[in-house]
């Protein structure tokens, strides 16, 4: 009897879709310039934005499939400021998406703690919902 129960558990575990395991966040954060994948691959810390510099939220995600939707948002506190959404036309080993402003708003960025918010959906289901550590713009 125990053998049958274990066999059923193994079958159930094997039949669970691996979609959530396949997609993973490689990099997520905010910096003061538009980044390239090569820059993120080096693993060097990127400079944080300040109230008087550009601010770009970025996310690099691996294991995405055709039809997946990836969304990156630059957020101040609980207020979304700038958002970029992309639906993939084909499978992608890694995908970099950015949202932000390459210029500086008149008078600088408003006070607050900023973070990058990432959402990845597949077939209408949330695969990944993650935020970077909040940082103040000084």
Can you describe what each PLM-predicted range is?
Residues 56-62, 73:
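Short edge beta-strand/loop segments characteristic of extracellular beta-sandwich folds
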């Amino acid at each position: 009897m125990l053998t049958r129960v274990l066999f059923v558990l193994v079958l159930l575990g094997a039949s669970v879709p691996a979609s959530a395991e396949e997609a993973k966040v490689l990099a997520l954060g905010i910096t003061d310039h538009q980044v390239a994948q090569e820059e993120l691959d080096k693993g060097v810390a990127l400079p944080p934005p300040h109230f008087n510099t550009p601010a770009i939220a970025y996310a690099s995600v691996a294991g995405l499939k055709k039809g997946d939707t990836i969304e990156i948002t630059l957020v101040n506190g609980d207020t979304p400021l700038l958002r970029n959404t992309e639906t993939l036309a084909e499978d992608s080993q890694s995908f970099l998406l950015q949202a932000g402003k390459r210029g500086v708003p008149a008078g600088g960025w408003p006070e607050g703690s900023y973070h990058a918010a990432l959402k990845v959906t597949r077939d209408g289901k949330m695969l990944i919902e993650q935020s970077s550590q909040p940082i103040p713009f000084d």
